[in-house]
């Protein structure tokens, strides 16, 4: 199990994306001739509700380092059906991306569990998108697969971890 929005989680997610043949096919051409990289902006992480010492040491370090004022940022580098990189960052100005998808932590949990479709969630304003929505719509199947792939990552959510004694 890996803790959501940590280095371990993003690395596992990257591996799972690259192992998915259906994603590779549906995302062919994504990011070719344009920047297809994303920042996932996870807002309102309830850090005050996370039990003390609940995280494994590396996840606790990541949460302390990468969650700033209740917000975390994850970079997903996507090109032509592959995920070439995935990692958390402190400041979104550190990288140039073509797209930023923003939303509250509770909505990200639903998306990471494949309880909502990303396109429907964007259209329903559960998330905001900075970037060319027409390009995202053209690759709607790939976007939906990214959500279902995230659900296959064995994930622990920071606010659902029991306190360790």
Named regions from a protein language model:
Residues 1-165:
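Feature captures hydrophobic
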